[in-house]
């Protein structure tokens, strides 16, 4: 299983993990980090950080994972530090794209949604900068994205920045919880692996 999980991520484009259940996503990210020497983790939704502070993630080693949890208005000032940290890492995780918008919520008119397109453009530029940097170092970059519902003619499931992710994601995965101790990982698109479903044990998180 170690080799399969390591082979899942590519350095040729984004690796996108889709999810409905935040706990299922946490199961996967806590598992995948255990197979990499050092991880830079941008924790926008702070779930992973909360679990580590509560000692609920078994494989968490302080020196192996560099956590960044930027607040509103802090991201731009942290870019240099983040990029410097990535240089010494073997994996970059951005978790999650949905929570990226919380950093700019004051710039969004919640009634008209004016300002959304500007933030989407900012997010796309942010991802492209990190993607190109990671590609130059041959470091995989994993982004997580919660599926949401949008009503057009009918309700459909769609990820944040759907068009950008479709164009830039070389690997597309979907994780779902089967039980407290087991989760499924669907390989949707991959440059070398056929679509399939992996069954993984959740051995990295303590539930209290």
Where in the sequence are the language-model features?
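Pre-Walker A adenine-sensing motif
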Residues: 1-12
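Conserved catalytic network of the ASCE P-loop NTPase/AAA+ motor domain
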Residues: 9-10, 34-35, 59-60, 84-87, ...
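Conserved P-loop
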Residues: 10-82
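Conserved beta-strand segments of the P-loop GTPase G domain that flank and frequently precede/overlap
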Residues: 18, 42-43, 67-69, 93-95, ...
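Conserved nucleotide-binding/hydrolysis micro-motifs of P-loop NTPases
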Residues: 45-48, 71-75, 98-100, 147-150, ...
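Conserved RecA-like P-loop NTPase ATPase core
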Residues: 65, 130, 169
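P-loop NTPase motor core
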Residues: 84-164
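Phosphate-binding/switch region of NTP-binding enzymes
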Residues: 133-208
């Amino acid at each position: 299983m170690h080799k399969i999980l390591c082979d899942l991520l590519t350095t040729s484009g984004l690796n996108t993990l889709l999810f409905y259940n935040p706990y299922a996503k946490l199961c996967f990210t806590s598992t995948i980090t255990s197979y990499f020497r050092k991880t830079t983790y941008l924790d926008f939704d702070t779930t992973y950080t909360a679990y580590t502070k509560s000692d609920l993630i078994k494989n968490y080693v302080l020196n192996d994972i560099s956590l960044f949890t930027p607040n509103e208005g802090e991201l731009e000032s942290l870019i240099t530090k983040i990029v410097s940290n990535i240089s010494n890492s073997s994996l970059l995780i951005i978790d999650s794209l949905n929570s990226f918008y919380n950093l700019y919520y004051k710039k969004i008119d919640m009634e008209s949604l004016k300002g959304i397109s500007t933030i989407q453009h900012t997010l796309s530029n942010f991802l492209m900068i990190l993607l190109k940097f990671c590609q130059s170092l041959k470091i995989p970059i994993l982004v997580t994205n919660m599926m949401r519902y949008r009503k057009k003619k009918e309700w459909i499931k769609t990820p944040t920045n759907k068009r950008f992710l479709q164009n830039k994601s070389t690997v597309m995965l979907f994780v779902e919880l089967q039980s407290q101790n087991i989760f499924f990982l669907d390989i949707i698109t991959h440059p070398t692996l056929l679509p399939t479903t992996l069954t993984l044990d959740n051995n990295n998180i303590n539930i209290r």
